[in-house]
A protein has these predicted regions:
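The AdoMet/dcAdoMet-binding core of the Class I SAM-like
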Residues: 9-141, 147-156, 161, 178
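Soluble small-group transferase modules, centered on the S-adenosyl donor enzyme superfamily
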Residues: 1-7, 11, 167-249
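Acidic/histidine-rich, surface-exposed loop or edge segments in extracytoplasmic proteins
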Residues: 1, 141-142
Length: 249
């Protein structure tokens, strides 16, 4: 678990709203990571949603999110909602083997700090995700800090672009006081649908004006980087080089 209850809504509302407002009546949603139930909480605000699949490798995390009183209060008991199915599996394996189709895929995985995590930021991973998307489906992934790890952020953008050449890639960011400026990458085949659907009730941070600003008016800048692959997991080296100057140990 890695969030502050004081400002986690900035992250989860942005990650979810950027995709959910860019697909007409999204019904089927896949969450990769998100075992704390906070992203599922946000997705359940959208009345068109019929099912959410949360794929998190750690059963202890998802059980804690279901049973801990404080976490349940924060995630609104989202993982116990009948529309939510929890799958304790590796995200890479799941999208590789799954035959399901989703309107929205949201990726809420930890940063690529080691080789075990590199596959979750590879062209192969993003290519498998594209195969799971409906024709007008949208994918959004968290993409590390645009301030602390700008080259890693750019590498994620370049990797998604290489894996999904027929889709438009949109990098953007929002400020989260606990973590700083945080980056996201959206991919879509229908950019004309961006932020075309209404936001749900109950949001504490995100609104249409803010969403328009971060996604259209001032999208995050990236530079061309070599894509990260299973054979050449460049993202790990780039991420750790970015972070080295900020570490005190």
């Amino acid at each position: 678990l890695q969030f502050s209850s004081l400002d986690e809504a900035r992250y989860h509302e942005t990650l979810s709203a950027s995709a959910m407002t860019s697909v007409k009546d999204p019904a089927h949603v896949l969450v990769l990571g998100g075992g704390d139930g906070l992203l599922a909480r946000e997705i359940l605000r959208y009345p068109s949603v019929t099912d959410i699949t949360v794929v998190d490798i750690d059963p202890d995390v998802t059980e804690l999110a279901r049973s801990n009183r404080l976490l349940k209060d924060l995630n609104h008991a989202s993982l116990s909602d009948p529309r939510v199915k929890v799958v304790n599996d590796d995200a890479f394996t799941y999208v590789q083997d799954s035959k399901a189709t989703y309107d929205v895929v949201l990726i809420d995985l930890v940063d690529p700090s080691n080789e075990k995590l590199a596959k979750l930021y590879s062209t192969e991973f993003y290519r498998n995700i594209e195969a799971r998307l409906a024709p007008e489906g949208v994918m959004v992934t968290q993409a590390t800090s645009t301030f602390f790890s700008p080259h890693a952020f750019s590498t994620v953008a370049s990797t998604v672009a290489a894996a999904q050449p027929d889709r438009q890639i949109l990098p953007f960011s929002t400020n989260i006081p606990s973590f700083g400026e945080w980056g996201f990458i959206l991919s879509t085949k229908t950019p004309q649908n961006l932020i075309s659907q209404p936001l749900p009730k109950g949001l504490t941070y995100q609104d249409r004006q803010t969403l328009e600003f971060i996604m259209r008016t001032k999208p995050a800048r990236t530079e061309a980087m070599e894509p990260s692959t299973l054979l050449h997991p460049r993202i790990v080296e780039v991420y750790n080089q970015d972070m080295r100057q900020w570490r005190y140990y």
